[in-house]
Each structure stands twice: as structure tokens, then as C-alpha cells.
């Protein structure tokens, strides 16, 4: 039986339509070259179906990625959720509309214990840009983390609204934690009601909501870190680096 990693490689080779990456960027309002290149490099285009490839259908079925004869994440952007050692726990798929995300159920995966992108964050935190050494940025959404990752920022996603004690303990691997919850009621609870059980010296950064007007009938709303990156790109370093250097516990608001 093939490993999940081997089957994922087959998915990338046979099912991911890289010609759709530009459409993914358009739907997510990504305009900067860094994130566009990142999407291509990581095969973040929309998935097709293996309907004429019996061998591929069989291996997909072996790992639980086949549903009624078709790839479970057909029509979605396929993103692997990995363990801290880099091995694949399961796959999650994104598309515009409802439901936006669909995670393939797997005995090796639980939102209660897994951080999204932890493997890359550990590598970037201790082997990447020295400005971020020993630090990590905690966000809610998968694409928040991926967008930061594209700019070399060690970032992990909760994949939900809470950070329980187990996941909070994992954060002790880092010297400095910067929490960036979404700007909504759930995100506000992360600080006000302490829904995120994070180290005591963690910094909370809130992105102030603002709508930008670009000429007649064209506007862009910034309400989370993904939106901020879509508009301002590499300027994110000007925001995060000073917070990394401050080892105390603070609350900051990113006023645009």
C-alpha cells in the first residue's frame, strides 16, 4: 500500500490543473508575485477527477480519498495538513462558496491536536529569516498561514476558533508567539474571553477593518491578515518584526 505522501504526489501530477492557479489568485484577490509564485510552486490549483484512470482511483481509495468513484476534493484547491515531522495527516480542500472548506476525515487527524503548517513554521522559525528566529505567528485560517508562509514568516493556523491547552502547550516550542485572530466576534473572544490558551508573553495583533476605494465602483475590504497581505504584501515585515523583538505580552491594533 502506498503512503499518503506518495498518493499526494500522484494527485499533484495527475489531478491538479495548474492552468487554474490564476483563477485561484483572482478569487482570493491575490495580486502580488510572491503569493502567485507560491501557489504555482505548491500546486494550489483546482483539482479534477480521475474518472478515466482506474489505477489512480484504486490508490486514492486505499488512503480514503475517493468518494463514489471520484476524488473527494474535486473542484477544490487541495492542501495537505501535515504533522510536525512533515508527514501528511490528511487533506483539506478550498473553494469559493459554501462550504468553503472540506477536510477529509482521517484517524490520523484531529483539529483538537493539530496545528496547520507547523512543520514549515518550525523550519522557518529556526532555520529561516533571522528576524523571526524563535517566533511564530498564530492565525485562524489556512490561507492566512499560507500567505504568511509565502513571505517567509513562520505561521500556523488554528483551523478553528479556539486554542485548547494541548495545542497551547505546543506553542512553548517557540520563544515568541504573535496571535492574529480574525476581526470578528469569534476573534475578539480569543483575547477578551481568553479562548486561546497561549503562552503568557504572547502578543495579540488585531487588524482594524477598513474598506479602500480605488476609483469608481472598485473597493477592497481589509479585515484579516490575508486581506492585509493581498493589499500590502511584503510590508507585513514592518508590522511583525517589531512585535517579534518585544518579548513582553502586549496587545496591538494594526490601524491601516
Cite the ranges covered by each PLM segment.
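Short charge-dense sequence patches
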Residues: 2-9, 141-144, 197
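TOPRIM metal-binding catalytic domain and adjacent DNA-binding surface shared by DnaG-type primases
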Residues: 1-78, 82-85, 127-131, 243-256
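TOPRIM fold recognition
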Residues: 25, 89, 100, 132-136, ...
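Aromatic side chains
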Residues: 8-11, 30, 101-102, 174, ...
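Phosphate-handling DNA/RNA-contact segment within nucleic-acid enzymes
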Residues: 50-175, 190-191
